[in-house]
Amino acid sequence: MMELEKNGNILLRRYEIGKLLGQGTFAKVYHGRNIVTSQSVAIKVIDKDKIFKVGLMDQIKREISVMKLVRHPNIVQLYEVMATKSKIYFVLEYVKGGELFNKVAKGRLKEDAARKYFQQLVSAVDFCHSRGVYHRDLKPENLLVDENGNLKITDFGLSALAESRRQDGLLHTTCGTPAYVAPEVISRKGYDGVKVDTWSCGVILFVLMAGYLPFQDSNLMEMYRKIGKAEFKCPAWFSSDVRKLVSRILDPNPRSRMPITKIMETYWFKKGLDSKLILKNVETNEPVTALADVNVVFSSMGSSSSKKTEEKQDAGKLTNLNAFDIISLSEGFDLSGLFEETDKKKEARFTSSQSASAIISKLEDVASCSKLTVKKKEGGVLKMEGASEGRKGVLAIDAEIFEVTPSFHLVEIKKNNGDTLEYQHLWKEDMKPALKDIVWAWQGERQDQQPEDHGQP
């Protein structure tokens, strides 16, 4: 329960709590009102013990610190962070105008309207880049419009707390978000956050002007191929200036892709530009209450359980992946597989809607039943070994858990040592059938996947 005053809806003598706006695995979001200024806010209430237990504390601390650097009129603002023994409270700017792309769903925007939103988007992204902050996941859900018609970017700095909009997370995310991701992210060659954000801005501009995506196909691999080659056509109603700009931004080569600074220098971008937009690209001196010492916010404040879980969090911390990382890990979706040889027989991947602790517990049970010993368990990785040496030494198997969302995980299991045939037999006969209770879907089996045969050839 939230720590409220006696009248039942005043939080820490500062905010009146209103209706529930939404909720996720770790957080509930309420409409709130500052009782001194009467300003409407959004209050995200985080369960402290839950985030300690899954090892998200360090990441959240970093991201709160980031929020101090990105105070801009076109970015949803974090006003304040407060904490009690059991809860953490994020007081955020309340944006009630809805998503920008709800407007696009009603029909494409006129050039002047699209330009205004694009100017605000690019201005905010450039501001963040100047402070070493990169979004890397600009997409429709992250673009809101306030009651004055101004663009507001969400999840700059608080992405770890963003809830999946649908419970199955990955399934819908892979169908929606990849259309906005840069070719270099898909190809797993490493990428520059600045250039990735620039590409996404280009896709967003196209959608605002066209009313549809530049890269779309019912086959995900075909869509990735189009993205990799920047294979798209501008509709007839695009002006020549817009065509040139979009083509230079959606350059599949990040080295020659038009940088944001150059975008802002183009005649098309500067047309009708509000000079205040650029002038406001100066960090404000307005204080951010309670952010001076992030660690104070996350102190146990007398909660022994929180302290104990914090001490243990490094051992249980999972690698946090966004949808693109997951897609890249999946052989069926990985474009690098078109150019590089991979040995599918030595590893397997599946997604699960179970908690990390439940997955680990199941893996330990499977290891025991398969006569494997768990030698090491840290950072979301379980290292398992056989009891005796085979033809090529002791069989060693690693299982690593990656977090997609707090309630959705990817598990990768691969042979680390020993005989491949021995591993394949053990996997097919014992391990894979035993894991079926926690599997949402097997990854990378589109071409050779068959009904479960429990080891029959």
Swiss-Prot record:
Q: Where is this region: PPI?
A: 345-374
Gene Ontology molecular functions: ATP binding; protein serine kinase activity; protein serine/threonine kinase activity
* List of catalytic residues: 137
Q: Encoded by which gene?
A: CIPK18
- Domains: entry comment: The activation loop within the kinase domain is the target of phosphorylation/activation by upstream protein kinases. The PPI motif mediates the interaction with the ABI (abscisic acid-insensitive) phosphatases.
Q: Which family does it belong to?
A: Belongs to the protein kinase superfamily. CAMK Ser/Thr protein kinase family. SNF1 subfamily.
Q: Which organism is it from?
A: Oryza sativa subsp. japonica
Recorded catalytic reaction(s): these are: L-seryl-[protein] + ATP = O-phospho-L-seryl-[protein] + ADP + H(+); L-threonyl-[protein] + ATP = O-phospho-L-threonyl-[protein] + ADP + H(+)
Region of interest: Activation loop: 155-184
Membrane-traversing stretches? none
Ligand binding (ATP): 21-29, 44
List the CDD domains hit by this protein, alphabetically: CIPK_C (cd12195), STKc_SnRK3 (cd14663)
In this protein, which residues make up the domain named Protein kinase?
15-269
Give an example GO biological process.
signal transduction
**Role according to the record:** CIPK serine-threonine protein kinases interact with CBL proteins. Binding of a CBL protein to the regulatory NAF domain of CIPK protein lead to the activation of the kinase in a calcium-dependent manner.
**Any idea where the NAF domain is?**
313-340
The entry's protein name is CBL-interacting protein kinase 18
